[in-house]
């Protein structure tokens, strides 16, 4: 995670175990938070406490605890769509939308 952060890569944190690793990385370098997104809230009992401690809001809450990266696979299209909306969607001004009645 720290090496990925140093390369300015996006970190998709998926589940409880990955969040524990993220906590360790965060304790070494808190700036890692600028590159991290929590994909989902696991059904593991401590995960909500851990994410709350880190100030993270997960993208999804589906009660998963499969340990197979499923939350990341489900969150990725949402993240990709959000990036495209931010980068490609026209503003009202650019699209010629007015308040005239």
Regions found by a protein language model. Give the residues of each.
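N-terminal loops that bind phosphate or other acidic moieties
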Residues: 1-101
């Amino acid at each position: 995670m720290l090496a990925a952060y140093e390369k300015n890569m996006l970190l998709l944190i998926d589940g409880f175990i990955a969040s524990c690793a993220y906590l360790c990385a965060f304790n070494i370098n808190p700036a890692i938070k600028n590159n991290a997104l929590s994909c989902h809230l696991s059904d593991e009992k401590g995960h909500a406490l851990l994410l709350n401690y880190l100030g993270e809001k997960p993208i999804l809450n589906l009660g998963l605890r499969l340990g197979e990266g499923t939350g990341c696979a489900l969150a990725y299209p949402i993240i990709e769509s959000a990036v495209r909306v931010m980068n490609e969607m026209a503003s009202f001004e650019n699209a010629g939308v007015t308040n005239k009645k």
